[in-house]
């Protein structure tokens, strides 16, 4: 095709072919989303039509179908993918006439690939798509849905239902929390970057809070969709805190009685992209601004018995353990580990504060921080994830840090911060993308959910929540058969238990420390040799309890 003809074709919408240096239209003024060969025919998919060409003169047109993909399995019989409407088979009955052969097959799965924020509650996983860019420069313009997984099936609170009930189209969800009211009804709150705060009671849209019915404000007095809310978090008393960007009072609180409160925080008022609220174990509230401008900072808010008055402390700069200045351009996420240390994600890597109470002092402008330093294969020390954009940090029950990045996948740091336990990316794992949005952990099972821009995966983690006693300890698989050569999981332990495995004569075979309430044994002794067939005793104790046999494991070699 000549360049002039090619240029002409590319300016048009439709289907064209060239004959004798002449461009001939087959379908005009219709945008085509996909084209593919099916059998010996050409299928062209528009927004609500499909054209199936036998040749340049003969084609069938199927109307009122939004087909994402098509494949043939017999002459004039096709499988069609209709997105959320499922998978169907159709057959040709005549010119432009098709009929469905089967009911739509709808696969059980998430409503959206985007897993912007995830929360685990009551052995259910709640996911929202979203939201806004890491720097807050723009929103993703995604319809708001809440996807819920109960380990058997998926359900979804669709945006159309919210539109019908609340007369507001939900979009750009940013954070989600789940609780129960006094009558044990499930309550879901979802914040939005422009549309306020949404409330669902027992999976039904109940309310949308914005400037018309609450103290929530629109950015800089703008009308329309500028009620920018984020950072949902419950404090120790059950009050719901949230950030409200670009307004006169940046912190809003919906107390457990349903009354609203507004807090004026000088370092946050009027600022762009106020992100998360981390409620620490001592009920302080850590708040980050992620936009890479002079506004980027961390703020700690403390309040005693009042939700209408608080003291705040702002800081931006750090001095690391090598006495170097550490001043990132933006603060992206926060977490508290089991030692009470505060971890902070930035555009230059992750740091942690071993004495976070110093942040609530007047002299906090150059806080001391620790940057994780590891040793490479050549014996040379290096800063862990130096100059890497950190998107999320989650701490498991073994005090290991799951760190998500913007393009490098997930890293798991050991309890003592001296070793990379796991490194997951699209090259070595089922991760669907290396651009990680969110990480959440089911504390009861240890399962880790990793959300990205392209979908959700889960990993059977080794750390679970510790039990109060040893009354329900068990191991699986048990017995361990010859074909099973991976790991044996011992679960139901108390936190940080010392676990010993012995033979029936009391000889020590293996010893480890539990990760929260769970320990792993690879059926090998201390020399790395797989143990002989037999029954092995599992003994466990904490620093405050007496050692006892908690379960047995049968190994068949």
Locate each region found by the language model.
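Single conserved hydrophobic/aromatic residue that forms the stacking wall/gate
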Residues: 1-13
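Conserved beta-propeller blade signature
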Residues: 7-8, 42-44, 77-80, 125-128, ...
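Residue-level detector of Asp-centered blade-edge/turn motifs that repeat once per structural unit
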Residues: 37-39, 72-75, 120-123, 178-184, ...
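Signature of short aromatic-glycine-proline-rich micro-motifs recurring in repeat-based ectodomains
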Residues: 110-118, 168-178, 220-233, 271-276, ...
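Short, conserved, GDST-rich strand-edge loop motifs in beta-rich repeat architectures
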Residues: 127-144, 195-198, 249, 290-299, ...
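Glycine-centered coil/turn sites that cap beta-strands in beta-rich domains
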Residues: 468-500, 518-521
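Glycine-centered tight-turn motifs at strand-turn-strand junctions
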Residues: 509-531, 542-546
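C-terminal tail/sorting-segment detector
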Residues: 537-557
